[in-house]
Curated annotation (Swiss-Prot):
Homodimer. Heterotetramer of two MnmE and two MnmG subunits. It is found in: Cytoplasm. FAD binds at G18, A19, G20, H21, A22, G23. The gene is mnmG. This is tRNA uridine 5-carboxymethylaminomethyl modification enzyme MnmG. Pfam families: GIDA, GIDA_C_1st, SAM_GIDA_C.
Length: 636
């Protein structure tokens, strides 16, 4: 075969490889910071595409979308423009686990994000496949495409998703492919291995799509959206919320014993169990055949029928991810209530792909092996659009900062769920597709859906990603919260017939002495609206998000204070830095596993070292003493 002749392409400040959810955020962030940015994608028709579930948000993930928005990212704005249904989850639980979820119009989501990218002044969007990196003396200086173009840059971000040596599997059928039958990237992985990177093989899957006209909705349970307005972005107005009658419902059905029997009888043809699939699959989103085997005692499993958009009849069968042969998939579908006559439009499939083992990354998402090279998204072993977008934003910010010769940006575990995710990846690594869960965050009471803007907008502003108008609106909100908290901390409520009648009606103890309005509001049965019956209203009408913050900050004050005290203790450990190029071989007394893990992961602080699996408190004590005594290897 004739070798493709290389030629010099344009020079850029930042190049982003891959335009999925990670790549889109990375490129927009870098460009908005003033960098001339190139965004390369295998297919222009798949920018920010949703090859799997047509939704954004959910537990932990919805909070990540709010964090992305607070930092100046795009996902929140984009889904607010393109959703077909919006629901707040876990409303019966505390604020720490509440999460917003939107059903997306997947085609509108792609089109809107592509349009946003095309309008960005510093950003060039181009179709092409990157086959290799330009690396000189351990520094990444650009990329080489399959057409021979050599584009140079000050920093490069890889967000290749599931395209890296992608392989689709449907029963006995296997072929090289990216997601949704797109072209795979077959050469870049080899180039990374040549540079010394350790790559792993992961697997994910997707369910069949069915024709919505052939679903019998009458025997399923409707799952409508919420009538009250919600949105992911600080910038979106309540007035823009789609009223309930114009939202699209999802529908709930279940597998049954017949479904399970069909699956069990065909396990000998299931790639998951025949050894065909080598990649490690996601623990928290298993295939239906995996669920039937692992949870053999369960009589049924939930399935949600979800619309893929307003202008398509394709419906997504959430919970039925599978790589079984096509004919078996059809039999499975027809065994399910409401899908007895469903026409399958696309079969489900599994896809294997390459992953950069994330212990090879810094908290900035720059690789330790190659300077100025960053990776984000499924490339780093995560699953989910939101996890990808969060990483993409951080990688794009840092690639942009590097191009501007400015210091790097990181988020701590106490700052954001994004910080929890990145710390988990770079400190612990992952042996399966990583999914964010509220249980992964030890400070989840202060990492809430409702306070993402209060936590992170200042940081977004410092990075140049929050404009003047938005920041002024944010400051007005923050000041309104402070003013009302101060006011409620000064006004007293005296016991009287009206107050005590209210308390008796709510089975609450009567007042014998006067109390501060803030203390009155701390009672579980008292809401802010109730409080306003007994005290004057605020001087200016308060927006509902201000009232929500006031109520949460007062009612959960004690718990929040305890969480903040734990954060302060963590900060002291984070302040204890581990010098670069420390020689762990020279430290006597470390346990063998701790020695191996510390040497492999190279933590930057004592706090990070303490979170590494296999490193125990005794090892941390030895390491701390070693550093305090100044017995460290010299930086070369």
């Amino acid at each position: 075969m004739t070798e493709v002749k290389q030629y010099p392409g344009r020079d850029y400040d930042v190049i982003v490889v891959g335009a999925g959810h990670a790549g889109s955020e990375a490129a927009l962030a870098a460009a908005r910071m003033g960098n001339r940015t190139l965004l390369m994608t295998i297919n222009l028709d798949m920018v920010a595409f949703m090859p799997c579930n047509p939704s954004v948000g959910g537990p932990a993930k919805g909070i990540v979308v709010r964090e992305i928005d607070a930092l100046g990212g795009e996902m929140g704005r984009n889904i607010d423009k393109t959703y077909v249904q919006m629901r707040m989850l876990n409303t019966g639980k505390g604020p720490a686990v509440r999460a917003l979820r939107a059903q997306a119009d997947k085609h509108a989501y792609h089109a809107e994000m592509k349009h946003t990218i095309e309008r960005e002044p510093n950003l060039t969007l181009r179709q092409g496949i990157v086959d290799g990196l330009i690396v000189e003396d351990g520094v990444c200086k650009g990329v080489i495409t399959n057409t021979g173009a050599r584009y140079s840059a000050k920093s490069v971000v890889l967000t290749t998703g599931t395209a890296a040596r992608g392989k689709i599997i449907i029963g006995e059928l296997m072929y090289s492919s990216g997601p949704n039958n797109s072209q795979p990237a077959m050469k870049l992985s080899g180039d990374l291995e040549r540079l010394g990177f350790n790559l792993e093989r992961f697997k994910t899957g997707t369910p069949p799509r069915v024709d919505g006209n052939t679903i019998d909705y009458s025997v399923t349970e409707e799952q409508p959206g919420d009538p009250e307005p919600h949105h992911f972005s600080f910038e979106t107005k309540d007035a823009d919320y789609i009223d309930l009658k114009h939202q699209l419902s999802c529908w709930l059905t279940y597998t049954n014993e017949t479904t399970h029997k069909i699956i069990r009888e065909n396990l000998d043809r299931a790639p998951m169990f025949t050894g065909v699939i080598e990649g490690v699959g996601p623990r928290y989103c298993p295939s239906i055949e995996d669920k039937i085997v692992r949870f053999a005692d369960k009589k049924r499993h939930q399935l949600f029928l979800e619309p893929e958009g307003r202008n398509t009849d394709e419906w997504y069968v959430q919970g039925l991810s599978t790589s079984m042969p096509e004919e078996v998939q059809q039999r499975i579908l027809h065994s399910i209530k409401g899908l007895e006559d469903a026409e399958m439009m696309r079969p489900g499939y599994a896809i294997e792909y390459d992953v950069v083992a994330p212990y090879q990354l810094k908290a900035t998402l720059e690789t330790k092996l190659v300077k100025n090279l960053y990776t984000a998204g499924q490339t780093n072993g995560t699953s989910g659009y939101e996890e990808a977008a969060g990483q993409g934003l951080i990688a794009g910010i840092n690639a942009g900062l590097r191009a501007l010769d400015r210091g790097q940006f990181t988020l701590k575990r106490s700052d954001a769920y994004i910080g929890v995710m990145i710390d988990d990846l770079v400190t612990k690594g992952t042996n399966e597709p990583y999914r964010l869960l509220t249980s992964r965050a030890e400070y989840r009471l202060i990492l809430r859906h409702d306070n993402a803007d209060l936590r992170l907008t200042d940081k977004g502003r410092e990075l140049g990603l929050i404009d003047d108008e938005r920041y002024a609106a944010f400051e007005a909100k923050r000041q309104a919260i402070k003013n009302e908290l101060d006011r409620l901390g000064k006004i007293r409520i005296k016991p009287n017939d009206e107050v005590n009648a209210f308390l008796r009606a709510h089975n609450s103890g009567e007042l014998k002495d006067g109390v501060l309005a803030a203390d009155f509001l701390k009672r579980p049965e008292v809401q802010y609206a109730d409080l306003m019956k007994f005290i004057p209203a605020a001087p200016e009408p308060l927006e509902r998000h201000v009232i929500e913050q006031v109520e949460i900050q007062i009612k959960y004050a004690g718990y929040i204070q305890k969480a903040e005290e734990r954060v302060d203790r963590l900060k002291k450990m984070e302040a204890k830095k581990i010098p670069d190029r420390i020689d762990y071989d020279a430290i006597d007394g470390l346990a063998t596993e701790a020695h191996q893990k510390l040497k492999k992961i190279q933590p930057t602080t004592i706090a990070q070292a303490s979170r590494i699996s296999g490193v125990n408190p005794a090892d941390i004590a030895i390491l701390s003493v070693y550093i305090q005594q100044g017995r460290i290897a010299k930086v070369q």
